[in-house]
């Protein structure tokens, strides 16, 4: 639950995310997606109150009212509730990595991207040699050539910077990767590439669970499960194929109809441009 003073902004969002699974949290603007994302990532603005639980164990990530154990390389922290703890205070082995839609906050403008990924890997407990090798591996995993490692973010395209953000998140070796509107401001080709990449990342060894935050229902189709938010509450959930093809709640129905119209309009516009 997220509250501001006496007002409840988000309530009853219970999730159970298995390793390497893909879940989409969808909703229109103001539905509560960003607040839920911030609560999970430990980046809620000051002044907001949060209650509930967020736990990590070998079987995945859980949020809601339950509890489970989380572990790191140095021991066990039985039943640690991460919700309400800022990201910097969360114990190792319980990392939740956030891929923000805003590259300017995710990437340092003056440090070469390969160095940034290496530093993130070192912060996860890797030696310098290991971290440098992993930086190369992570660049490769997100479809970037290691020759780009020496470039600062400003010398990369928007799609390349988003890929670097994904590599940076992987370097944290998280149990959960939250991708917050990762295709915002990308062109159609870059958008499709990022969605394909997100799908492929969950097939990596020791892949994290993926939580995709989006208002874009076609993007949600890459996920196995969909959770629909409206007014800070869950109104519908289930397998993506079922929810997107046969929505039950009126709000979800309206969202699917609007998405279908946008898809048709986009196809017509593309056809007109090609003519």
Where are these regions (language model features)?
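ABC ATPase NBD coupling module
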Residues: 61-97, 115, 123, 243-247
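C-terminal boundary and immediately downstream tail of ABC-type ATPase nucleotide-binding domains
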Residues: 99, 244-275
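Conserved ABC ATPase "signature" region
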Residues: 130-147
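Conserved catalytic motifs of ABC-family nucleotide-binding domains
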Residues: 173
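Conserved catalytic segment of ABC-fold P-loop ATPases
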Residues: 221-228
């Amino acid at each position: 639950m997220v509250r501001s003073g006496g007002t409840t902004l988000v309530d009853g969002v219970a999730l159970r995310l298995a390793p390497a699974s893909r879940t989409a949290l969808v909703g229109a603007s103001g539905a509560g997606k960003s607040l839920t994302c911030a609560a999970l990532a430990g980046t809620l603005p000051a002044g907001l109150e949060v209650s509930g639980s967020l736990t990590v164990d070998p079987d995945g990530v859980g949020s809601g009212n339950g509890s489970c154990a989380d572990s790191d390389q140095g021991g066990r922290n039985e039943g640690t509730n991460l919700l309400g703890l800022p990201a910097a205070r969360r114990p190792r082995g319980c990392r939740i990595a956030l891929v923000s839609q805003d590259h300017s906050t995710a990437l340092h403008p003056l440090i070469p991207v390969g160095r940034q990924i290496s530093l993130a890997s070192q912060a996860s407990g890797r030696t310098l040699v290991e971290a440098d090798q992993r930086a190369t591996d992570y660049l490769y995993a997100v479809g970037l050539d290691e020759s780009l490692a020496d470039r600062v973010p400003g010398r990369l395209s928007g799609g390349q910077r988003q890929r670097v953000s994904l590599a940076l998140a992987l370097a944290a070796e998280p149990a959960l990767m939250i991708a917050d509107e990762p295709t915002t401001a990308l062109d159609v080709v870059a958008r499709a590439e990022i969605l394909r990449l997100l799908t492929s990342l969950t097939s990596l060894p020791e892949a994290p669970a993926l939580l995709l935050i989006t208002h874009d229902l076609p993007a949600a189709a890459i996920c196995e499960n969909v959770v629909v938010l409206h007014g800070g509450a869950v109104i519908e959930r289930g397998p993506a194929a079922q929810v997107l093809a046969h929505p039950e709640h009126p709000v979800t129905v309206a969202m699917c109809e609007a998405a279908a119209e946008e898809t048709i309009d986009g196809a017509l516009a593309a056809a007109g441009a090609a003519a």
